[in-house]
Regions:
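Contiguous hydrophobic, helix-prone segments at protein termini
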Residues: 1-226, 230
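Short, flexible coil/turn micro-motifs enriched in small/turn-prone residues
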Residues: 67-68, 153, 223-225, 229, ...
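Mature hydrolase/peptidase catalytic cores and their serpin-fold inhibitory cores, especially
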Residues: 199-267, 276
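Acidic, glycine-rich flexible loop/linker segments
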Residues: 240-255, 260-262, 266-329
């Protein structure tokens, strides 16, 4: 049975854990920055001083630990074990808390509107999909901590130089399957070079092999289409920031976030954006779900957006029609 646009939008309006995270982060940042000494340690990016000041502020420490226990595994590239989490990357954590401390980010959760049984069923399980993503992220965070602990033991034994080197070994190298004397540690440097090489190019999202001929891994064609998927309704014009990787831009330096792809760890950055443009994704990708829930206009599927637009460009985002246009460059 066909479904009209209005019914489609209604179906996609469901609660997820993302709004809860953003609101708790906003509450936490404001509470921490009430304490002058804690705020100063964040501004100086001094993790030692931060921990010291947190120990003397019971309420702030309690709120911080509550957030970390619930959302500690949620950070950019959260499903990549080699990526530092928010407990390790204090600079990013400081930037995030300071940014949120001065912003109005109290988003309301989607209200339960009248709906049919099957609409409610869809929303229930679509929402749980996001819950499971958070559980997965937290589990990856736990596994990273365990891996780093093993890495530190390997460093003490002189087997590897850095604890992070553990991620370039095979699982059999650390679970006891292979004897320590038989592990080939030289593959660490080889795999690091391979890892850095594969970070240097962006292959096409999909390709086909015709008559046994493989296409180039490099996508040389620049698609100039301004049309994508209108993932979240609304219109906005503003300054763009183009991010190849996750980072917290300077306060008030941008309005529209443009990137290749996101994962749930980008939620905190999306929440302080007025518009979102993503090259890859679909109507149920995380960026789409978060944008709808937070009421931020978003267009997904604008090919080569990171090449066509530059940081500082003024662009127009139409989440209703799925169109993105450059106003000035």
């Amino acid at each position: 049975k066909g479904i009209n646009k209005k019914s489609h939008q209604k179906l996609l309006d469901f609660k997820s854990v993302s709004t809860k995270q953003v609101n708790q982060l906003s509450l936490l940042s404001k509470e921490l920055c009430k304490d002058i000494k804690i705020k100063k340690s964040l501004e100086e990016k001094n993790s030692t001083l931060f921990k010291k000041n947190m120990r003397r502020n019971f309420e702030a420490n309690k709120l911080f630990n509550s957030y970390i226990n619930k959302f500690g595994g949620r950070f950019a590239n959260e499903s990549k074990l080699e990526t530092k989490d928010i407990n390790e990357d204090f600079n990013s954590l400081s930037d995030l808390l300071l940014t949120y401390s001065t912003m109005n980010t109290n988003f309301k959760e989607s209200a339960n509107k009248s709906e049919t049984f099957f609409e409610g069923l869809f929303k229930k399980f679509a929402s749980r999909r996001e819950d499971f993503r958070l559980l997965r992220a937290n589990m990856f965070g736990v596994f990273r901590k365990l891996s780093i602990s093993i890495g530190k033991e390997y460093v003490k034994k002189g087997l590897i130089k850095n604890s992070d080197d553990i991620f370039y070994l095979d699982f059999e190298d650390i679970d006891g399957t292979i004897k320590m004397d038989d592990i080939d540690f030289s593959k660490i440097n080889i795999r690091k070079k391979e890892y850095n090489f594969f970070k240097t190019f962006q292959p096409p999202s999909h390709f086909k092999v015709a008559n046994g001929i493989w296409p180039s891994l490099f996508d040389s064609k620049v698609d100039q289409s301004n049309s994508g998927i209108g993932a979240s309704r609304g219109k906005v014009t503003g300054r763009a920031v183009v991010l190849e990787e996750f980072s917290i831009p300077e306060k008030d330096s941008f309005d529209i976030l443009i990137t290749r792809r996101t994962d749930p760890g980008w939620t905190s950055l999306m929440a302080i954006s007025k518009g979102i443009v993503v090259e890859h994704g679909g109507i149920l990708s995380h960026a789409s779900i978060v944008a709808r829930e937070l009421g931020i206009p978003a267009v997904i599927g604008i090919k080569n957006a990171c090449k066509r637009f530059k940081t500082g460009d003024t662009i127009f985002v139409d989440g209703d029609k799925g169109v993105v246009e450059a106003i000035s460059k």
